[in-house]
């Protein structure tokens, strides 16, 4: 790797011995382990797409967008300047640019939009490449990808919403009814303050409207301590119906075009994943539809959870790969004690250990 050339502008010193930025390279083509895994696991037909994603993710443009999205985190706007409740999250334009590209690549829908052997493998490889540009946008992409199998428990809801969730068009820069948009994104809200992962301890309630039942209407009242990607168009939520803990599809807008009674309380102050908004919410009689049977909420929503957990693993492996790539790039452009760091025996051992751990994470 080339080092940064000396540039004028410092009266006191010269800038020397600094590695160059790792950019304008192909993330996929430079990862022989991921390339081999894609072919070995049945996704080789998508190599061309993976190369395209890899070229974007490694580009200076994508890397800049990623930095900008993290340096300018999302901001919650509960009310407009006239005092009206709006419950919106504002993102830096780079967030929307990245998300638009990710949706266009099919990272939110490929296995459902183009079902064929190896489709999940292909998407996984592309997801890992894309995450090396910016990881936060992976949350709404993952949630949207994961909602489809759970939503299919209620065929009429799937018929209405699946075409929106599998669209290759991103239409999320402005909050408006999903029926007026070219594409939609999905989120999830399960956790409550008192229960955490013990969702059986949830207290949020669902009251049937017009009889309720599978696909029927309910009013949701309660809270969620963690709501993923709150600017999405619809969410799977858990609430206690008369028949027990149940799964519901809760959109940001009601069928008549009014904002649903889903009120964002605050955004989480997180250690990482800062470009992406995670929120606390309250439902005050919010309109929702039952997905599946009453009392079958956990088995229904677990279909979504399982797929998101796959992406959690992919995200961790992606982070490891980024760390290795950045470390090797730095050590290839910085010298110490008369040698490049990459040529120092002790550093070679460290880099080899990191590379082995990254390879193991990728293939497992």
What residues fall within each predicted segment?
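Internal helix-loop-helix
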Residues: 84-173, 228-229, 358, 362
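Short Gly/Pro-enriched turn/cap motifs at secondary-structure boundaries
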Residues: 194-197, 226-228, 240, 270-277
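Buried hydrophobic positions in well-ordered alpha/beta secondary-structure cores of metabolic enzymes
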Residues: 147, 188, 206, 220-222, ...
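Internal maturation/activation junctions in enzymes
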Residues: 157-204, 208-209, 213-216
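Extended amphipathic alpha-helical segments enriched in small hydrophobics
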Residues: 309-364
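A glycine-rich, basic-preceded beta-loop-alpha segment at the flavin cofactor/substrate interface
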Residues: 256-258, 265, 280-308, 325-343
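Extended, charge-enriched "interface" segments that sit outside catalytic cores
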Residues: 1-116
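A short core secondary-structure module
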Residues: 216-261
